[in-house]
């Protein structure tokens, strides 16, 4: 078993309550399907109501389970091509090696990353290295777990300048229905979040963040309520008086509709509110 989260997944439950079930200012469509040969296809498109700009992407994924290989190809409307090859749980249980490349045909620009991660019950660690001969940037992270407590560190080192460009710490606690997460980024940005699963229907979350040398404190609360197995309501508000509301309805197995709205509580009569529509189809 490899239950220790990665550094980026620390506090994920609280983030999901704040972020999932909303899509302000856009119309979004997500489609997922799988062929008889095992190739997974997923595509998404969204159009912003403010600007009218539309974009989309297509992803195909094929797994060779006997060898632990996964091949992923990506394309988006910015004409960026991506290829990812990963090898997992073969050299060692919990070890994943990945080659991720990006190619932009219009400009000829090429970039890539080598990634490695290793996850076990009591720890997880990983590293990414940019493929850049002029001076790659090295990213690294580690998370230790002990009786529900989690401690993490994340860094990035710019070899061209020979200095740390990122230096982050995190500390938290995770239980079945409760999670606490705190973090410090580069010694100047501080934040924390609390997640509570009240019961099978209600989830709540609180987050707080501030920057050293600034009076700009950010605070928000969010909740999700499941009316039944097909319907859920979401709501959130922050100290800027921005109120988010979301409604998610499973129309039938594999078909989901999401409606959301962002209301400016300080300027309620002035307009400027945003609405969103999302449609997910999986077959």
Curated annotation (Swiss-Prot):
The PTM Phosphothreonine maps to 4
Chain segments annotated as transmembrane: 26-35, 39-47, 54-64, 69-76, 80-89, 95-104, 111-120, 123-130, 137-145, 150-158, 163-175, 178-185, 189-198, 202-211, 218-227, 231-238, 242-251, 254-263, 273-282
According to the UniProt record, list the residues that bear N6-acetyllysine: 12, 15, 20, 90, 266
- Report the CDD domains cross-referenced here: Porin3_VDAC
Q: Which residues carry this modification: Phosphoserine?
A: 241
Listed GO molecular functions? Answer: nucleotide binding; porin activity; voltage-gated monoatomic anion channel activity
Q: Quote a single Gene Ontology cellular component term.
A: pore complex
One GO biological-process annotation of the entry reads: learning
Q: Where in the cell is it found?
A: Mitochondrion outer membrane; Membrane
Task: Look up the domain of life of the source.
Answer: Eukaryota
Q: Explain the consequences of disrupting this gene.
A: Male Vdac3-deficient mice are infertile as a result of reduced sperm mobility due to an abnormal mitochondrial sheat in spermatozoa.
Function of the protein: Non-selective voltage-gated ion channel that mediates the transport of anions and cations through the mitochondrion outer membrane and plasma membrane. Forms a high-conducting channel with a stable open state and a voltage-induced closure with a mild preference for anions over cations. Involved in male fertility and sperm mitochondrial sheath formation.
The record's family statement is: Belongs to the eukaryotic mitochondrial porin family.
Domain text: Consists mainly of a membrane-spanning beta-barrel formed by 19 beta-strands.
Record's protein name: Non-selective voltage-gated ion channel VDAC3
């Amino acid at each position: 078993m490899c239950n220790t989260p990665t550094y980026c997944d620390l506090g994920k439950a609280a983030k999901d309550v704040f972020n999932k079930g909303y899509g302000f200012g856009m119309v979004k469509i997500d489609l997922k399907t799988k062929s008889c040969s095992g190739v997974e296809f997923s595509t998404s498109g969204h159009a912003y109501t403010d600007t009218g700009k539309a974009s989309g992407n297509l992803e195909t994924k094929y797994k060779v389970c006997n060898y632990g290989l996964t091949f992923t190809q990506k394309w988006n409307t910015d004409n960026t091509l991506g290829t990812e090859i990963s090898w997992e749980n073969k050299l060692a249980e919990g070890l994943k090696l990945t080659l991720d490349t990006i190619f932009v045909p219009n400009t000829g620009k090429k970039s890539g990353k080598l990634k490695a991660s290793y996850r076990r019950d009591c720890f997880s660690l990983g590293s990414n290295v940019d493929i850049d001969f002029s001076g790659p940037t090295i990213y690294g992270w580690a998370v230790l777990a002990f009786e529900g407590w989690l401690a993490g560190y994340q860094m990035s080192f710019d070899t061209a300048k020979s200095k740390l460009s990122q230096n982050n710490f995190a500390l938290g606690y995770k239980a079945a229905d409760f999670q606490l997460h705190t973090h410090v980024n580069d010694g100047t940005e501080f934040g924390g979040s609390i997640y509570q699963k009240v019961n099978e229907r209600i989830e709540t979350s609180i987050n707080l963040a501030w920057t050293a040398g600034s009076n700009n404190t950010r605070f928000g609360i969010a909740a999700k309520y499941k009316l039944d197995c097909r319907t859920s309501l979401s709501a959130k508000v922050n100290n800027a008086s921005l109120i988010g509301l979301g409604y998610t309805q499973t129309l039938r197995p594999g078909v989901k509709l999401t409606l959301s709205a962002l209301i400016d509580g300080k300027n309620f009569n002035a307009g400027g509110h945003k609405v969103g529509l999302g449609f997910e189809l999986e077959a």
